[in-house]
């Protein structure tokens, strides 16, 4: 596992439902107010996209259903192999670090451990997650598969762009039987991109897409969409915390199925 690959994410954001105004696809936008919180005051008119690009973790996939069991198994193995001593670090430390480079994640989660322990943790995490996917206990968010099918039936081209490793991202899509719905599944692990901005740029250029919605739960998704001049739909339904995470999104949704309504009401 290359140390330069960015780790997958869990959404960390809570906000009330986005209110969708009827007619002409007009919806409240989100902008930081002077206190740094999000304000639902400015309106945006959405255009129907030719494609939607989805983040995987915290957007389509409930990452914690796979990550947290693997996290505890990982530390059991590290202790057994002599790479780590003491209690397993709090889950919150791991969850709060997701989205960083893997090498930086372990510096936060177990700063006292050796570089060898960090690299072994890289290997174990991917291994345990692939095994967990085979075990069938992980979950997509409610109605994700059905919503994706409905969007595809309406002619929307569907893609994934994730900062995770290739085997992990595609493994999630295959395990949950959504892989056939996507025209392309892009990952930092496959393309060795330094940021999601670059990954989305590659996707857009390769498939000659001019108008897309970037759908995701993290600031990197907002950045990837905006830096590539695309609309950003912020996913605020996983409930893990930083208020500023999705600042700059064109729309916030609190349920994945809201995408169908937004698409239907867009111009």
List where the protein language model places each region:
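Conserved Lys-Pro-Asp/Glu-containing loop-to-beta segment of HAD-superfamily phosphomonoesterases
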Residues: 196-222
């Amino acid at each position: 596992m290359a140390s330069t690959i960015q780790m997958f994410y869990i959404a960390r954001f809570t906000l009330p439902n986005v209110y969708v105004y009827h007619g002409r696809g007009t919806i409240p936008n989100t902008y930081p107010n002077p206190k740094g919180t999000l304000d639902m005051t400015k309106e945006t008119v959405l255009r129907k996209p030719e494609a939607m690009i989805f983040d995987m973790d915290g957007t389509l996939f409930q990452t914690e259903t796979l990550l947290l069991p693997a996290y505890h198994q990982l530390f059991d193995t590290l202790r057994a192999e002599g790479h780590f001593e003491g209690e397993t670090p709090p889950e919150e430390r791991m969850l709060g670090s997701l989205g960083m480079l893997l090498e930086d994640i372990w510096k936060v989660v177990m700063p006292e451990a050796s570089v060898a322990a960090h690299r072994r943790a890289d290997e174990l995490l991917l291994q345990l997650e692939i095994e967990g996917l085979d075990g069938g206990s992980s979950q997509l968010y409610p109605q994700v598969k059905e919503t994706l099918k409905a969007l595809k039936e309406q002619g929307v081209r569907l893609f994934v762009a994730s900062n995770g490793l290739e085997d992990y991202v595609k493994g999630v899509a295959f395990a949950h039987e959504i892989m056939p719905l996507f025209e392309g599944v892009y990952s930092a692990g496959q393309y060795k991109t330094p940021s999601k901005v670059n990954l989305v740029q590659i996707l857009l250029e390769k498939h000659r897409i001019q108008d897309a919605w970037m759908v995701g739960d993290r600031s990197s998704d907002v950045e990837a969409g905006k830096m590539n001049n695309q609309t950003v739909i912020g996913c605020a339904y996983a409930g893990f915390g930083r208020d500023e995470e999705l600042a700059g999104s064109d729309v916030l949704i609190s349920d994945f199925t809201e995408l169908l309504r937004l698409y239907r009401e867009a111009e």
